């Protein structure tokens, strides 16, 4: 075989192998509230000799819409149960998936705002009245935003809070509105409130979980997902992953 032909053959073979490897890399869509916990879980997954996965963070609603329109996500780590079940109904996933965690809603306040958080309704009214803006995730896209509105209405705080609300595409962005001072108060996941970046700038208060629908976070595997996505799906249900989730404030099944 002439040398130039051999070189072309080897180069073509290299391209084919590279494309095959890239095509098999799992792409995981992860709800923003899971960012810190998922990062640690992913590190643990790789430490067991598994291949790296590509990770994208955002809102469960946006991810669902993107998957419906052909986005190549192999695994959705959602912040609720509605969106994964909808993907199954639309024939995108292999089944309805499983609940991997139950989230907790909290209120956070910017330390420099000087707003006291208390589970006393009187104190909450004072806090809301003092706040300039209150950040939440968009309720149609993010389960933690939906839970925040349910809480405000159930607690009788909706009328004094509604005109101060500013909406973010996901709970991670809503949280950063408070961290950066764009809002004095906000609703977020306890896992984000406990993160180093957020906790040094804010304080938080747990919201009564009886005042909003349980945030049962479900994950679902798409049809045609590569083996690595299936491996990660199984790892998320392991005792090691559950221990990490619990550390970040989640309950696990």
Describe each PLM feature range:
Residues 11-15:
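Hydrophobic helical h-region of N-terminal Sec-dependent signal peptides
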Residues 96:
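Active-site phosphate-binding/coordination module
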Residues 1-10:
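Bacterial N-terminal signal peptides that target proteins for export
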Residues 23-50, 54-56, 61, 65-71, ...:
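Exported/periplasmic ABC-transporter solute-binding proteins
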